[in-house]
Amino acid sequence: MAPGTLDDNSADGSEATWSEASARFIAHLRHERGLSAETVRAYAGDLDQFREHMNATAGTADPRLSQVDADAIRGYLAALHKTRKKTSRARKLSTLRSFYHFLNDRELVRENPAALVAYPKLGTKIPSFLGVDDVFHLLDSLNAGAARAGASWRRCRNWALFECMYSTGVRVSELAGMDESDVDFHEGMVRVLGKGSKERIVPVGGKALDAVKLYLRVLDSQFPEARRMGSALFRNARGRRLTTRSVHRLLRMELRRCGLWQHLSPHGLRHTFATHLLNSGADLRAIQEMLGHSNLSTTQRYTHVHVDQLMKVYDAAHPRSRRDRSGK
C-alpha cells in the first residue's frame, strides 16, 4: 500500500486522516457510483470545507477521523448559520452522513457522528417544478451512470424511467403501468392508459427512446428471466412491475445522488414537462391533450410561466401585438 492511502484491512481506520479517507470516498463516488464530475466536485468541496473548519477551530490541519465527533459537526453547521441557507447546510450535513456511511460499510469507523446531528428544518414549501438546467443536470447524471462500463440494469432503468417521465409528462401511475408493447420505437409514440381507462397517444423524445432501448438490452443481458414475469416496462429487483411508491423513492434518491436537494415528486416532473413546453411557445390545448386533462383549467394550474415569457410568446404570435414594450 502506498504511503498516505487508506486500506480496508487497517487495524483502526479511525486513525486515518481526513484527507486520506476523503480521497478514498471521492474515488468511490467517481469510479464505483459513476457520479458526474460536477457532483463529485461538490462532495469534495464539502469535505474540504469541513477540514478547513477543523483547522480554524481546533488547530488541526488534517484531523484524524477519531478527532471528529457530533459536537464538532454541530459547531461546523453553527458556523455556517450566518452565511449559508438552510438548504445549503442540509446538503453539507448530508455529504458528511454519506461519507461516514461509506466508512461504516467498510468497517473503517465504528460510528457515524453525522447521523447524530439533526438536519436544519427546511419548512414545508415544496417546489413544484425544476428549471431546464436542473432537469438536464439530473438526466445527464443518470445518462452518465447508465453509460458507464458494467452499469447495472437498474441504473439503466432509472435513466429510462425519468427520461420517459420528463419526455411525455405522464402521471406516475401511468408510467408504472406501461408495458413494453406500449412503446412504438418506429413512430416515436407511447400508448398511455389514463384516468377512467381513457387511452391516449403521446409523443416521446429520442433521448427517452435511446434510454429505453439501452435499459431493455442490459435487462435482457443481466436479468433474462425478467421477461417471464409479466409485460411491465419498468421492473423492480424481482423483475415485477415497479410501484408508484418505488418511483417516488427512486426520484428522491437520484436527485440527491446528483446534488439536487429540491423536494420534488414525480408529479413535479409532470408540472416541469408542461411548464417547459409552454415556456417554449407550445399551444396550451396540445399540452392538455398530452397530459390527458379533461379541462383546460386543470392544465393551466400545471404551468408556471413568467409574465415576461408570456409577453414574448404573445409578441411573437399575435399579429396585432405591440412589438415595442419600452413605452415609446
From Swiss-Prot:
PROSITE patterns per UniProt: CB, TYR_RECOMBINASE
Keywords: Cell cycle, Cell division, Chromosome partition, Cytoplasm, DNA integration, DNA recombination, DNA-binding
CDD domains hit by this protein: INT_XerDC_C
Domain Core-binding (CB) stretches: 16-104
MF GO annotations: DNA binding; tyrosine-based site-specific recombinase activity
Residues the record marks as active site: 171, 195, 267, 270, 293, 302
Superkingdom, taxonomy of origin: Bacteria
GO BP annotation list: cell division; chromosome segregation; DNA transposition
Pfam hit, one: Phage_integrase
Domain Tyr recombinase: 125-315
Subcellular localization: Cytoplasm
Subunit structure, interactors included: Forms a cyclic heterotetrameric complex composed of two molecules of XerC and two molecules of XerD.
Protein family according to the UniProt entry: Belongs to the 'phage' integrase family. XerC subfamily.
Annotated function: Site-specific tyrosine recombinase, which acts by catalyzing the cutting and rejoining of the recombining DNA molecules. The XerC-XerD complex is essential to convert dimers of the bacterial chromosome into monomers to permit their segregation at cell division. It also contributes to the segregational stability of plasmids.
Name recorded for this polypeptide: Tyrosine recombinase XerC
